[in-house]
């Protein structure tokens, strides 16, 4: 099988095309699920944590082909077999009920807002606005190729590192929070998931 993550959140790198391969395709869609239309028939397994676009952490969405589900190892405990979860309609054990409830509210909000086509257009608009500003600035930079830039996690650096603390302080004073980049790479990161306003 081939496993990939279409949106890498730390460095803001995205694969915008679904790989065409002759092996089972599996994907971690945590940071992009429900941000755009998706042809799930091109995948054998998709999984996504809820905490980005669906609801609180503690809930995972799994979409799996029947063929792959039937190949599961029957020696595994029931809790580790997707086929058992499917047979039990996702009620093999007590589910995280608040997360389910909250996810239901989010699904209705997405539908009322115009569905996945709406969010795809909105997310592109939000990202383009940020990237255009960064690219035309003498203060900021993003060194990723445009074709590989994430529409969800816009990373950037200040050209003068001495300004990082001041930038974060002024951002916070203007209600722009949590812009500090991941500890592994530094810089800045604006995560613009579905619920983030334009």
Question: Where in the sequence are the language-model features?
Answer:
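Active-site C-terminal subdomain of aminotransferase-like
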Residues: 50-131, 145
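Conserved PLP-binding active-site segment of the aspartate aminotransferase-like
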Residues: 154-160, 176-198
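Active-site phosphate-binding strand-loop segment of PLP-dependent enzymes
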Residues: 1-33
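Conserved PLP-binding catalytic core of the aspartate aminotransferase-like
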Residues: 140-171
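Conserved active-site segment immediately N-terminal to the catalytic lysine
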Residues: 26, 40-51
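Solvent-exposed alpha-helices and their adjacent loops that cap or buttress functional pockets
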Residues: 17-20, 37-41, 52-56, 146-147, ...
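Conserved hydrophobic/aromatic beta-strand scaffold that supports enzyme active sites
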Residues: 1, 45, 59-63, 153-155
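Short acidic/polar capping segments at secondary-structure boundaries
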Residues: 6-11, 30-33, 38, 51-54, ...
């Amino acid at each position: 099988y081939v496993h990939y993550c279409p949106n890498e959140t730390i460095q803001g790198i995205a694969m915008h095309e679904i790989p065409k391969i002759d092996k089972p395709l599996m994907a971690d869609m945590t940071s992009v699920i429900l941000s755009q239309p998706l042809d799930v028939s091109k995948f054998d397994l998709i999984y996504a944590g809820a905490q980005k676009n669906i609801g609180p952490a503690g809930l995972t969405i799994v979409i799996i082909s029947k063929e792959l589900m039937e190949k599961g190892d029957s020696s595994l405990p029931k809790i580790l077999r997707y086929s058992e979860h499917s047979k039990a309609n996702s009620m093999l054990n007590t589910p995280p009920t608040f997360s389910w409830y909250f996810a239901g509210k989010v699904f209705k909000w997405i539908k009322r807002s115009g569905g996945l086509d709406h969010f795809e257009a909105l997310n592109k608009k939000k990202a383009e606005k940020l990237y255009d500003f960064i690219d035309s600035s003498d203060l900021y930079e993003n060194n990723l190729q445009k074709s590989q830039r994430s529409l969800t996690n816009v990373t950037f650096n200040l050209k003068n590192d001495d300004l990082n603390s001041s930038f974060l302080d002024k951002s916070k004073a203007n209600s722009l929070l949590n812009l500090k980049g991941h500890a592994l790479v530094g810089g800045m990161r604006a995560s613009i998931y579905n619920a983030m306003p334009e």
